Amino acid sequence: MAEAGARRPFFRRRKTCPFTGTNAPKIDYKDSKLLMRYVSERGKIVPSRITAVSAKKQRELARAIKRARFLGLLPYVIR
């Protein structure tokens, strides 16, 4: 069968959405600390393929970030 020195191939575990499930944080435009985790160092919204956020929650997140920017809670551009 398998040799003694043979290794299993590496399979990356599929990440789950951090906003679904029990005791998951609610997406709120006033929670700037949470929203800053999903904004890059240049101020752009990080895509869901990197953050593993589901499509529905990514839309909610983008809407909350844009609302927080409009109200002055988050910067548009970080220098």
From Swiss-Prot:
InterPro entries: Ribosomal_bS18, Ribosomal_bS18_CS, Ribosomal_bS18_sf. One of its GO terms (biological process) is translation. Belongs to the bacterial ribosomal protein bS18 family. Pfam families: Ribosomal_S18 (PF01084). It comes from the Bacteria. The lineage of its organism: Bacteria, Pseudomonadati, Pseudomonadota, Alphaproteobacteria, Hyphomicrobiales. Part of the 30S ribosomal subunit. Forms a tight heterodimer with protein bS6. It comes from Rhodopseudomonas palustris (strain BisB5). Keywords: Ribonucleoprotein, Ribosomal protein, RNA-binding, rRNA-binding. GO terms for molecular function: small ribosomal subunit rRNA binding; structural constituent of ribosome. One of its GO terms (cellular component) is cytosolic small ribosomal subunit. This is Small ribosomal subunit protein bS18. PROSITE patterns: RIBOSOMAL_S18. The keyword RNA-binding applies. Binds as a heterodimer with protein bS6 to the central domain of the 16S rRNA, where it helps stabilize the platform of the 30S subunit.
